[in-house]
């Protein structure tokens, strides 16, 4: 692996997992020493992070980790809904060969939903398998490219909220409905199930975000809503 790729993947993962917090300055000298590479690969990695939207150029020289605001989260989910419902419809409209794997996936999610204890890491690996199968069955490279870029930010947003066992089981049931609808070749149900899942996923993040700045933004938004309705 090239030094710039290694630096990029390391920094991207640290941003996604909140090891590098929003506003943190990405200083080339400090990072090159910590990562054990020269400044040029670090500079290239930072440029890629800026292009991804995970870092923000502040003036001529300083680059910081991008923040995640309440409007941005809602915009992400608005785009996610458009992309993922389109993928779900396309997958459910695909031929039997492309839809066959969703039978097994639906069963796997149904089994997960019945478990008393559902570990998050294996569960999200199963979700990733479903995403990959939907991308393949949807057979639209442009939508796939767009949603894969968005998933980088969505993973970061998901980690803002602590996993809840009840929510994981509910999410498993929702994913089972999506997979079953695709397996049955029902685009309308696949779209509706995807829309419902995304509504619940966004609600969970808004209700359980752990970052103080984000919680403050949610509280302010709630106060404005109350003012408008009073």
Residue spans for each PLM region:
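C-terminal regulatory/effector modules of DNA-binding transcriptional regulators
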Residues: 34, 164-230
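Short linear motifs at protein or domain termini
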Residues: 1-93, 207-230
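Short linear sequence motifs
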Residues: 1, 70, 95, 102, ...
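Flexible, glycine- and charge-enriched loops at secondary-structure boundaries
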Residues: 4, 120, 164, 168
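Conserved amphipathic alpha-helical segments that form helical-bundle/coiled-coil interaction surfaces
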Residues: 97-160, 172-184, 189-199, 203
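Mobile beta-alpha loop/short-helix "lid" or hinge segments that flank ligand
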Residues: 51-56, 150-152, 167-169
């Amino acid at each position: 692996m090239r030094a710039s790729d290694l630096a990029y993947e390391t920094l991207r993962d640290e941003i996604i997992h909140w090891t590098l917090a929003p506003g943190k300055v990405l200083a080339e000298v400090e990072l090159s020493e910590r990562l054990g590479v020269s400044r040029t690969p670090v500079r290239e990695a930072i440029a890629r992070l800026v292009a991804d939207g995970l870092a923000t150029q502040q003036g001529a020289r300083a680059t910081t980790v991008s923040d995640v605001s309440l409007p941005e989260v809602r915009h992400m989910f608005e785009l996610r809904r458009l992309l993922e419902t389109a993928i779900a419809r396309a997958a459910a409209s695909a031929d039997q060969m492309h839809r066959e794997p969703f039978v097994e996936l639906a069963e796997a999610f149904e089994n997960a939903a019945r478990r008393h204890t559902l570990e998050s890491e294996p569960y999200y690996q199963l979700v990733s398998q479903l995403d990959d199968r939907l991308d393949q069955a949807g057979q639209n490279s442009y939508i796939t490219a767009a949603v894969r870029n968005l998933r980088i930010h969505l993973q970061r947003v998901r980690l803002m909220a602590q996993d809840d066992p009840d929510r994981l089981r509910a999410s498993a049931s929702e994913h089972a409905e999506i997979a079953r609808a695709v397996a049955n070749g029902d685009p309308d149900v696949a779209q509706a199930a995807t829309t419902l899942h995304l509504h619940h996923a966004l609600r969970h993040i808004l209700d359980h975000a752990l970052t103080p700045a984000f919680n403050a933004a949610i509280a302010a938004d709630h106060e404005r809503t109350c003012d408008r309705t009073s």
